[in-house]
Amino acid sequence: MKLTRRYRFSAAHRLDSPRLTAEENRTLYGKCNNPYGHGHDYVLDVTVDGSPDESGQIVAREPLDELVRERVLQRFDHRNLNADIAELAGVVPTTENLTVVIGKALADGWTMPARLDRVRVSETERNIFEMEL
């Protein structure tokens, strides 16, 4: 059985690769290459997989929420992904890369009996990135 919890955070970024020319960056990243950056209201879905325990739950909600607060929301909410997130230093902070960083952050802190199954980060209604763990 799987449980998915949904969280929200806002962050800014600029997609710009030092390996590309200014023209190549504009062509590849479009409006996401705005020199002043831009922001998104991200939606994070965290899915766990397991069997209900004697309490009837796959995982207690509060410890899961606390882990996500500590490992993701407090670190990423209202931040500039280019400047404020060490794991994204030196890489283009695409939502693909952001999803990997979030997945690793949650996996590294995971101590619950249920298995951390996947993370899914929605950047927009049309851009949704999912990573199985």
Question: Could you describe each region identified by the protein language model?
Answer:
Residues 1-133:
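Charge-rich, low-complexity N-terminal segments
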